[in-house]
Amino acid sequence: LELGNNAIGYVAAWNTEYAETCSGINAFTLGVQSVNPDATVYVNQISTWGDEAKEKAAAQALIDTYNVCVIAQHCDSAQPQLCAQDNGIFGCGYNSDMTEQAPNSHITAAIWHWNVYYQTAIETAMTCGDPANFVTAMGGAAYYAGLAENFVDTSALNEATAAPNTAAVMDAVRALIVSGEWDVFSGVKLSYDIAEDGTVTVNKTDAPLMTNDGTEIVAAGGPSVDDGVITGSMNYNVEGVVVS
């Protein structure tokens, strides 16, 4: 908003081919729209899990084509963040804190505290008895945890690049997610009011969750998309996503 630019770039390893990447793109877009309802997220897919040259080229193409003011990503290297820094714009990383590599552009990144999983797995292995019981005791073959378990997190906010009151807004939304009061894939959208003293008020508005082709996924005020869809079968992009 401060940049007067509604264009956001996103370098994606994949998109609707995998629920992991698709849900990440969608969740990021919905978060962006809570701050700037007029924002469009332009996705450039590189069709590989890792290729630093392609990641950098995809970021540069988003900048050149759409004049994006932020580069986000679902790929592991810091090349998109370095490209953002080279072009004087901002960025959000993935998998690790990329502020050290791009201190003048990087804001924060989605990260995972793997020690949470390792501790859970080791303690379960020690107490489940027969090793054949391990998978069942862990809750299934796939392990899922989130903010409430401190497995999913965001890296330390780079105060040199973050807008004022960003931390307060993030903390307020985190509290809603952890408490179960709100979910990003529900039929409820968020917006924020910030008082002069920095106090954040989160506003919740019933609104349908729509795809970018106009299909309604969740009715206004409706419950979140099922976890199994988010983690296993989500194959659409939400309204506001443009795939380049």
Predicted regions, residues:
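A residue-level marker of the well-folded mature domains of exported/periplasmic proteins
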Residues: 1-244
